[in-house]
Amino acid sequence: MTEPTVARPDIDPVLKMLLDTFPVTFTAADGVEVARARLRQLKTPPELLPELRIEERTVGYDGLTDIPVRVYWPPVVRDNLPVVVYYHGGGWSLGGLDTHDPVARAHAVGAQAIVVSVDYRLAPEHPYPAGIDDSWAALRWVGENAAELGGDPSRIAVAGDSAGGNISAVMAQLARDVGGPPLVFQLLWYPTTMADLSLPSFTENADAPILDRDVIDAFLAWYVPGLDISDHTMLPTTLAPGNADLSGLPPAFIGTAEHDPLRDDGACYAELLTAAGVSVELSNEPTMVHGYVNFALVVPAAAEATGRGLAALKRALHA
């Protein structure tokens, strides 16, 4: 007798209504500038943003200079605050300090921490590994200058969404391997870590909102032009961190979305971390789509999902 199919939950109705009203989809044929413009259309009403002390800086390390960052201080400022280095999403090709300003603010408030949001160089103008190089230089700068910001250099975490989750995972490995600042936590929102496009969620959610398979292919073509990714196990660990030795990495929270092509990628990375002895919490959000952290201020279910990751980050930083 055939087992009955268990229907998965639908997309949260408030989120679905928002996506239907303000579609942000694009195709590879549209090109990167159209994609960037569509992402910039997602704006949070200013009155919903928490008022924080914010400072623009240009940082650098070891020959890499002129990396823009935006520093956020939490509502209650005290000495030796923990520091979160945040890497925005957007397929390594879109986004920046402004598109992810609400997200950075949420991390400063939710984690009660200083947040340094990094404006790394984007593809296709600057393909891999330019963004990784900038991100690493910014993390090294934070490690050496945390005290000047009022931060505690012994309590630094990385966080990022989507491509920024990929970068955060890479940064955690580099910090372990290349003598970077010791990290206490990694918060990975719907990251891409495996580059294994054969995972079931890439087919199951091939036409999902926000991020579909066509968009994924465009991002990869812009970020790693001409690279054969058919054998994901042969990719460098700074592109596919799931290929690395994962032992000795900091604890992690991985947030995934049921209606997201990257869902199984995050789940696989969580399994690999666990097998390597790393403490990891995986939270798959059954009614969410890719990018839900960006909707936390306007969609209650997205706020609840985001809150789970921020709570884990806060616990790790204030243990």
Curated annotation (Swiss-Prot):
A motif (Involved in the stabilization of the negatively charged intermediate by the formation of the oxyanion hole) lies at residues 88-90. Signal peptide: none annotated. Its EC number is 3.1.1.1. It is an enzyme of class 3 (hydrolase). Monomer. PANTHER family: AB HYDROLASE SUPERFAMILY PROTEIN C4A8.06C, ALPHA_BETA HYDROLASE FOLD-3 DOMAIN-CONTAINING PROTEIN-RELATED. Hydrolyzes various short-chain esters, such as triacylglycerols and vinyl esters. Has no activity against emulsified substrates. This is Carboxylesterase NlhH. It comes from Mycobacterium tuberculosis (strain ATCC 25618 / H37Rv). The lineage of its organism: Bacteria, Bacillati, Actinomycetota, Actinomycetes, Mycobacteriales. The gene is nlhH.
